[in-house]
């Protein structure tokens, strides 16, 4: 590990349609094999569908869905004296967003709807209503952290 200066995080360019860095990150997470224009088309179609269903703005509806999936605590494995403990730790804000987006995309890919845009729209609308696979994933992570609260003093 070099002892020189700490390198800052790269700036991500905001997406062309809404000017949101969060949405640009979401497009990048959804993208497969470098096909960004395809990923953008899927996201924009899904947001259009979501906005029509919810009656809110595109970004506002997306934000609500993302908020309901963001985890606040997670567990990390820590080895102490020959046994491994699942230690609950708070999730940093950047990682919260990354995990939430990853879980939404993962859940959308597993759905059985016709197109990816429709699957994504359905998953986002479920997330906005606090239901769906991505929200369940967050609840499972929180439940795991709650169950292992006794090991919180092993934090590092």
UniProtKB/Swiss-Prot annotation:
GO terms for cellular component: small ribosomal subunit. GO terms for biological process: translation. The keyword Zinc-finger does not apply. The keyword Chaperone does not apply. Keywords: Ribonucleoprotein, Ribosomal protein, RNA-binding, rRNA-binding, tRNA-binding. GO terms for molecular function: rRNA binding; structural constituent of ribosome; tRNA binding. InterPro entries: Ribosomal_uS7, Ribosomal_uS7_bac/org-type, Ribosomal_uS7_CS, Ribosomal_uS7_dom, Ribosomal_uS7_dom_sf. Part of the 30S ribosomal subunit. Contacts proteins S9 and S11. Belongs to the universal ribosomal protein uS7 family. One of the primary rRNA binding proteins, it binds directly to 16S rRNA where it nucleates assembly of the head domain of the 30S subunit. Is located at the subunit interface close to the decoding center, probably blocks exit of the E-site tRNA. NCBIfam families: rpsG_bact. This is Small ribosomal subunit protein uS7. It comes from Pectobacterium atrosepticum (strain SCRI 1043 / ATCC BAA-672) (Erwinia carotovora subsp. atroseptica).
């Amino acid at each position: 590990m070099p002892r020189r200066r700490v390198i800052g995080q790269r700036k991500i360019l905001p997406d062309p349609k809404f000017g949101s860095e969060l949405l640009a990150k979401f497009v990048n997470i959804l993208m497969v094999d470098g096909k960004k224009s395809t990923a953008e088309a899927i996201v924009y179609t899904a947001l259009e569908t979501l906005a029509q269903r919810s009656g809110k703005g595109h970004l506002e509806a997306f934000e609500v869905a993302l908020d309901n999936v963001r985890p606040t605590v997670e567990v990390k494995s820590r080895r102490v004296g020959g046994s491994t403990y699942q230690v609950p730790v708070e999730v940093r804000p950047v990682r919260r967003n990354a995990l939430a987006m990853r879980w939404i995309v993962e859940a959308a890919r597993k759905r059985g709807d016709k197109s990816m845009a429709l699957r994504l729209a359905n998953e986002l609308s479920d997330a906005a209503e606090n239901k769906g696979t991505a929200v369940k994933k967050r609840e499972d992570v929180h439940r795991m952290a709650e169950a292992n609260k006794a090991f919180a003093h092993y934090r590092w």
